[in-house]
A protein has these predicted regions:
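Sec-dependent N-terminal signal peptides
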Residues: 1-9
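Hydrophobic alpha-helical segments, principally membrane-spanning helices and signal/leader peptides
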Residues: 2-3, 142, 249
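C-terminal motif of bacterial Sec signal peptides marking the signal peptidase cleavage site
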Residues: 15-18
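N-terminal secretory/targeting leader peptides
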Residues: 20-136, 154, 159-377
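A gly/proline- and charged-residue-enriched helix-loop-helix capping module
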Residues: 133-150
Length: 377
């Protein structure tokens, strides 16, 4: 337990800052970490239920389980959260309401599923041609991003903590090669996200909705010509390369992503401070772990799918990429002009970029990285 707490306190220096300056972060520092339950018999035994938008065995669900495991470890087993995969307690599209109403105490989600309630939730879960996973991480922990989550979920009687940050998705997997916008215009494609759907419509691309569980069969039967799911390791888990060998990358429609845990505010307020600290610390540790673990698995799956499974990577020309980029920004600016909540989140993201982009440009290849080629040997 001592070693875990030392690691937890170290991870806690990542911090979860509030909106505004990093100095006003309210981060989980060593003083707060000491308030985590360290085996005190004075603290109550608490049991929660945690639903999920993810199915059993899905990598995202394993992250939900890891979060719950950490909460239990940090409280010496006095606070336990039992995980239930999608469909066990409720359908994925019911989870938000179940947590909001207190039917269950918490739920693991991806905010884009709640875009029908408010499009601001989509920005909290992914962006088109904008934030990378590392951008999300820095924005949430240092740039005031966490407060945007609290503000939005707080409107629905919830508090929220990110527990998993994803890097850019794989791209579109298709049964025919995609090398241009024109190619996509002649296809029926599964694409997630309200904003991505609007951008696709402006680009003349025919988008359809297909459940992730039906994606393999839909591609196999020709119901759709292409589709996206997630990052390489998640795509590999569905074996999409067996029915769609072409792989158009990068994923302009989802350049990074965030999963988290929704917590009913009444249930949260009933917890002793030590258990609230344990939840926050578990979320910080889980986010840090998954940021590297998930990308490492993507490295391995990409190599496998290209070298063993015969996937063929295609790219579009720069003019088409520029058209897509400009269209994505146009969609965002239009939504920000008509949705105050969306604008609140979008403005915070733009403030972050204003701070980050100057130094990012100076770093060039030495910032987010580059690949060695023959000229570098």
């Amino acid at each position: 337990m001592a070693s875990l707490l030392c690691g937890a306190i170290g991870a806690a220096t990542l911090g979860l800052s509030g909106c505004g300056s990093a100095a006003d972060s309210g981060m989980m520092d060593a003083a707060n970490a000491n308030a985590v339950a360290g085996g005190s018999s004075d603290l109550p035994v608490v049991t929660w239920k945690m639903g999920s938008t993810w199915g059993d065995g899905n990598i995202h669900f394993t992250c939900d389980e890891r979060f719950s495991e950490l909460v239990s470890q940090l409280t010496d087993g006095r606070f336990t959260i039992t995980n239930y995969p999608e469909g066990s307690l409720c359908a994925a599209n019911q989870l938000f309401d179940y947590v909001q109403n207190g039917t269950i105490q918490c739920g693991g989600d991806w905010g884009g599923y709640w875009s029908g309630k408010d499009t601001a939730f989509e920005l909290l879960s992914t962006t088109m041609d904008n934030f990378t996973g590392m951008d999300y991480y820095i924005w949430i922990t240092q740039g005031g991003g966490l407060q945007c989550y609290q503000d939005m979920y707080g409107k629905y009687n919830m508090t929220y903590f990110p527990i998993m940050i994803n890097h850019a998705e794989s791209g579109i997997r298709s049964t025919r090669p995609i090398t241009s916008i024109k190619d996509m215009q002649s296809m029926k494609i599964r694409l997630g996200g309200v904003m991505a759907g609007r951008a696709a419509e402006k680009l003349g691309i025919n988008i359809t909705t297909v459940a992730a569980s039906e994606l393999y069969e839909s591609l196999q039967r020709g119901v759709i010509d292409g589709g996206e799911f997630s990052t390489p390791c998640s795509d590999d888990s569905l074996k999409l390369q067996e029915v769609a060998k072409y792989w158009c990358s990068p994923a302009w429609y989802q350049s990074g992503g965030v999963n988290g845990v929704m917590i009913n505010k009444d249930a949260w307020n009933q917890l002793p401070e030590e258990y609230q600290n344990a939840i926050q610390m578990a979320a910080e540790i889980c986010t840090s772990e998954q940021l590297s673990r998930y990308l490492w698995m993507d490295f391995e799956s990409t190599k496998k799918m290209l070298e063993e499974d015969g996937c063929i990577v295609t790219e579009m020309n720069q003019d088409d990429w520029n058209t897509i980029r400009n269209t994505c920004r146009e969609v965002y600016e239009e939504e920000a002009a008509q949705n105050e909540n969306f604008n609140m989140v979008y403005s915070s993201m733009k403030d972050y970029r204003e701070k980050a982009d100057t130094y990012r440009a100076m770093l060039g290849d030495y910032g987010w990285g580059f690949n060695y080629d023959d000229s570098a040997k």
